[in-house]
C-alpha cells in the first residue's frame, strides 16, 4: 500500500477551506492520487460540494459528521477521521495525499500531530484586519497560513500590508500567502509549498 501524506485544512466558518481544497485538488489530481475527508457537525454539506464540483470521483471523498465541537474530531478524539482514512485507503490503495478539512472553528483549533503530517490554516480578510494580531494556535502553529478574499479588503477597510506585518510577527519565517480563490490569485504559492515542502520536489 502506498505511503500516504495527510494535510489538515482548518479555519473559521466561511473562510474558504472547501474552495481551497477544491482548487488544489483540481491542479494536482492529474499527477497524483488524492482523497479528501470533510468534517461537518450535523451534515455532509462540504462533502456534497466537493462531489458536485467533479474534481474527484465520489469514492475518493468521505464526509464525517462530528456531532459536536469541531476541534474535538481533529484533535482530542480523532477516531472518526482515522476510520475515514482507513476507508479511503481500502477504496483506493494508491492514495498518496489525503486532505482533511476541519469543521469551521475558532482561532485556537489545531490538528493532532497523529492525524496529519502537515496543516494549513485559512482566514479571510472580511473577518477584519485585526485577526492576525489576535494570534491563535491555528495561525501560529500551522505549517502554511492563508489569508483569503483579498478582493474584499477595500470594502471592510483592511490593510493587506498591515495584515502581512502582523502575520510575520507571530509566524517568523514560516510561509504564508494572500489569496483570492475566485481568481486563483495566490494559489501558485500554496501549490509550490505542497510540491516542494511537503513532497520535497524541486529541491535537487
From Swiss-Prot:
A single GO molecular function, which one?
Answer: nickel cation binding
What does the entry list as the binding residues for GTP? 11-18
Under the heading Gene3D superfamilies, the entry gives:
P-loop containing nucleotide triphosphate hydrolases (3.40.50.300)
CDD domains, per database record = UreG
InterPro entries to which the protein is assigned, alphabetical: CobW/HypB/UreG_nucleotide-bd, P-loop_NTPase, UreG
Question: Which Gene Ontology BP terms does the record give?
Answer: urea catabolic process
Q: Which UniProt keywords apply?
A: Chaperone, Cytoplasm, GTP-binding, Nickel insertion, Nucleotide-binding
Q: Name one Pfam family in it.
A: cobW
Query: Gene Ontology terms, cellular component aspect?
Result: cytoplasm
Q: Where would you find this protein in the cell?
A: Cytoplasm
What quaternary structure, including any partners, is listed in this protein's UniProt entry? Homodimer. UreD, UreF and UreG form a complex that acts as a GTP-hydrolysis-dependent molecular chaperone, activating the urease apoprotein by helping to assemble the nickel containing metallocenter of UreC. The UreE protein probably delivers the nickel.
Q: What protein family is recorded?
A: Belongs to the SIMIBI class G3E GTPase family. UreG subfamily.
Purpose of the protein: Facilitates the functional incorporation of the urease nickel metallocenter. This process requires GTP hydrolysis, probably effectuated by UreG.
UniProt-listed HAMAP family? UreG (MF_01389)
Instruction: Specify the protein name.
Output: Urease accessory protein UreG
Q: Which organism is it from?
A: Staphylococcus saprophyticus subsp. saprophyticus (strain ATCC 15305 / DSM 20229 / NCIMB 8711 / NCTC 7292 / S-41)
Amino acid at each position: 500500500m502506498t505511503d500516504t501524506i495527510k494535510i489538515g485544512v482548518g479555519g473559521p466558518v466561511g473562510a474558504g477551506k472547501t474552495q481551497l481544497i477544491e482548487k488544489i485538488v483540481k491542479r494536482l489530481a492529474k499527477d497524483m492520487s488524492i482523497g479528501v475527508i470533510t468534517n461537518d457537525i450535523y451534515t455532509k454539506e462540504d462533502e456534497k460540494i466537493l462531489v458536485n464540483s467533479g474534481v474527484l470521483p465520489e469514492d475518493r471523498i468521505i464526509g464525517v459528521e462530528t456531532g459536536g465541537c469541531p476541534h474535538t474530531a481533529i484533535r482530542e478524539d480523532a477516531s472518526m477521521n482515522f476510520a475515514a482514512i482507513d476507508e479511503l485507503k481500502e477504496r483506493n490503495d494508491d492514495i498518496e495525499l489525503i486532505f482533511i478539512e476541519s469543521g469551521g472553528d475558532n482561532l485556537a483549533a489545531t490538528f493532532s500531530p497523529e492525524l496529519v503530517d502537515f496543516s494549513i490554516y485559512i482566514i479571510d480578510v472580511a473577518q477584519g484586519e485585526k485577526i492576525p494580531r489576535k494570534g491563535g494556535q491555528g495561525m501560529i502553529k500551522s505549517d502554511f497560513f492563508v489569508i483569503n478574499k483579498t478582493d474584499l479588503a477595500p470594502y471592510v477597510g483592511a490593510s493587506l500590508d498591515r495584515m502581512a506585518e502582523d502575520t510575520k510577527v507571530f509566524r517568523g519565517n514560516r510561509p504564508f500567502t494572500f489569496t483570492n480563490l475566485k481568481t486563483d490569485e495566490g494559489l501558485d504559492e500554496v501549490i509550490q509549498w505542497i510540491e516542494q515542502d511537503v513532497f520535497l520536489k524541486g529541491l535537487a
